[in-house]
Regions:
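Alpha-to-beta junction loops
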Residues: 2-6, 207-210
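Short Gly/aromatic-enriched secondary-structure transition segments
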Residues: 327-344
Length: 364
């Protein structure tokens, strides 16, 4: 009904993005460690993150910004700067799967939708760079066929021993494969992941972000009743590798496909680039004609992003917070950017505030 503006989920292999694509909503998958996971039941704790579902990119990013805070109680929490949305540079290079490696599983409507979305990106002036996605698929394969399944086993090990029928039969079938892995297998998979990361690194350094289909195709409930494993595996084509590569991402609805099903596209960036992928998503959202989720409410066009976003304030500092001095790091940790050195006019006076410990400077 459009009453709820956002909800939280978790994302290990795409659970924060695939449902968003299927339901015409935004799915924001943050950088690993940026949102506290205290109290969250994990799937794979080392690569899990809390995710955000919302009707619009702006709502999703606002929730992310509020939740982005270091948590000392969460051993996987990391400190991240809170950076605002801003107008993306039109010279930005965006990587997409090339024609030889892109996968749609014979869904022509999905292929046409993605091609149309890429044409929009080109119209904004972005440089599109087709890349071979086979190494990404190899990494995705590790998540469910490799020893990360054993990490899932640690979460429900006791339940499987005491009451195995309490676990869905398909889930049980997948996770019980963990018994076949040894500690040596785990190290081999980590070595394999490092090798694939090395192979992919030149690709990722040649572009600012990736743009992929959120899902390669759609499946019905009936499809999943016949074969619950293959369709789910296919739905993770463009999601399963993301957390293993420590990337962030956002799934944003686009114009509906020609058959009426929801259109969608996903932007992926490196860790800490959450504001960049959200900024390009909101730019993309601005030029789409769609309803919000399952409602009949039309998307209201978001405000134009500015090069110098109004989330920034111009401030002048004196004393130890100046560039190169001992407290300047406090400003930088809050996302401050140095602009210029300057001098005060003769009307200003500089004071030592001796009643403070340590003594602080004052400028009037």
């Amino acid at each position: 009904h459009g009453i709820v503006s956002f909800s939280l989920g978790t994302d290990t292999a795409g659970s924060g993005r695939v449902p968003a694509a299927l339901n015409n909503i935004v799915g924001l998958k943050p950088s690993l460690g940026s949102l506290s996971a205290s109290g969250v039941v994990p799937a794979c704790r080392t690569i899990d993150t809390v995710s955000v579902f919302a009707m619009t990119v702006e709502d999703a990013f606002n929730v992310f910004t509020l939740l982005n805070d270091y948590d000392e109680k969460d051993s996987y929490s990391k400190p991240f700067k809170k950076l605002p949305l801003s107008l993306p540079q039109s010279s930005m290079k965006i990587g997409i799967p090339d024609k030889s490696s892109i996968r749609f599983f014979d869904d022509n409507f999905q292929a046409e939708s993605f091609e149309s979305n890429i044409d929009k990106l080109k119209s904004y002036g972005f440089e599109i760079l087709p890349i071979n996605f086979e190494p990404f698929y190899e990494i995705a394969h590790l998540l469910y066929e490799g020893s990360w399944v054993a990490e899932r086993y640690t979460v429900i090990e006791n339940l499987l021993k005491v009451n195995p029928k309490a676990v869905h039969s398909v889930t049980r079938q997948i996770i019980q494969k963990a018994k076949n892995f040894s500690a040596a297998d785990t190290f081999r998979d980590y070595y394999k992941l490092s090798e694939l990361k090395r192979k992919i690194n030149p690709i990722l350094t040649s572009v600012k972000m990736l743009c992929v289909p959120s899902i390669p195709t759609f499946y019905s409930v009936k499809d999943l009743e016949v074969d619950p494993i293959t369709p789910n595996s296919n739905l993770g084509t463009y999601t399963n590798f993301v957390n293993l590569l420590d990337m962030c991402g956002i799934t944003v609805p686009t114009d509906p496909r020609k058959d009426g099903r929801p259109g969608s596209i996903t932007f992926l960036g490196m860790s800490g680039d959450d504001n960049i992928v959200a900024s390009i998503a909101i730019l993309f959202e601005k030029n789409c004609n769609r309803f919000l989720g399952g409602t009949k409410f039309k998307l209201e066009k978001p405000n134009d992003l500015q090069e110098n976003n109004n989330s920034y304030l111009d401030i002048a500092v004196c004393g130890a917070h100046m560039e190169g001095l001992s407290l300047n790091w406090q400003l930088k940790d809050l996302g401050a950017q140095f602009v210029q050195k300057s001098k005060t006019s003769s009307y200003y006076n500089f004071f030592a505030l001796t009643n403070l410990n340590p003594v602080r400077p004052g400028l009037l």
